[in-house]
C-alpha cells in the first residue's frame, strides 16, 4: 500500500487527519494560555477536543466519503456495511464528547460540534468542496480555544487575534486541499498556483496574530 493512497485505512489519510483533526484544536487550546486568559490548562478538555477532532476528521468524514466514492475511485477502505457500522460507533463517541463538554463548558461547544458534523458530509452527492473542510479547520481552532476559556465574553482584541489564527487555519487547509485534489482537477496548473498562493496568504494572518 502506497503512502499517498486515499481512503479510510490509508496511512496518508490517518497522518493528515491527525495533523488537522488533532493539532488544530490543540493550537486553539494553546492560544488561551498564550493570550493570558487562563493560568492552567483544562487538560481533560484538550484531550477530548483533540480526540473528537481526530475521530471526526478521520472516521466520520472518511466513512462518509468512502461510502459514496468507493465505486468512483480506488480507495483503501472497508466494505460499505463495515463503514456504516463504524460510522454508528463514531457518532456515539462524538455525540458523547459534545454533550459532556457542553455540560462542562457551555452550549457553544454543541454549536461547534454541529458545524463539525456538517462539514464532515464531504462526498459527491452531498457537500463536496474544499471550503467546507477549511471551515472545519477554522472551527477546530475556535472550538479548542473556547473549551479552554469557557466563555464568549472576552475583549474584542482577544477575539481578533483568535480569528486571525483561525483564518490562518482556514486558508492553510484550503490551500492544502486544493493541492491534494490536483488529480481531481486533472493537474490544472491554475489550481496548483492558486493552492500555493492561498497557502502563502495564510501566513499573513499568522503574522498578524503575533504583531497585533
Describe each region flagged by the PLM.
Residues 127-135:
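Membrane-interface loop-to-helix entry segments
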Residues 1-121, 134-212:
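Hydrophobic alpha-helical transmembrane segments
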Amino acid at each position: 500500500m502506497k503512502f499517498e493512497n486515499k481512503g479510510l485505512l490509508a496511512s496518508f489519510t490517518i497522518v493528515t487527519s491527525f495533523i488537522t483533526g488533532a493539532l488544530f484544536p490543540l493550537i486553539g487550546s494553546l492560544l488561551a494560555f498564550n493570550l493570558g486568559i487562563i493560568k492552567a490548562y483544562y487538560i481533560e478538555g484538550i484531550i477530548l477536543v483533540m480526540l473528537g477532532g481526530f475521530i471526526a476528521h478521520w472516521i466520520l468524514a472518511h466513512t462518509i466519503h468512502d461510502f459514496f466514492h468507493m465505486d468512483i475511485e480506488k480507495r483503501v477502505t472497508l466494505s460499505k456495511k463495515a463503514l456504516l457500522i463504524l460510522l454508528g460507533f463514531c457518532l456515539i463517541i462524538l455525540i458523547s464528547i459534545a454533550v459532556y463538554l457542553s455540560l462542562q463548558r457551555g452550549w457553544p461547544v454543541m454549536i461547534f460540534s454541529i458545524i463539525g458534523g456538517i462539514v464532515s458530509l464531504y462526498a459527491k452527492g452531498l457537500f463536496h468542496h474544499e471550503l467546507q473542510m477549511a471551515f472545519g479547520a477554522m472551527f477546530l481552532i475556535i472550538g479548542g480555544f473556547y473549551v479552554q476559556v469557557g466563555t464568549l465574553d472576552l475583549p474584542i482584541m482577544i477575539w481578533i487575534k483568535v480569528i486571525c489564527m483561525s483564518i490562518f487555519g482556514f486558508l492553510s487547509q484550503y490551500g492544502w486541499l486544493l493541492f491534494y485534489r490536483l488529480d481531481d482537477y486533472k493537474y490544472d496548473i491554475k489550481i496548483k498556483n492558486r493552492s500555493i498562493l492561498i497557502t502563502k496568504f495564510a501566513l499573513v494572518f499568522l503574522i498578524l496574530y503575533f504583531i497585533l
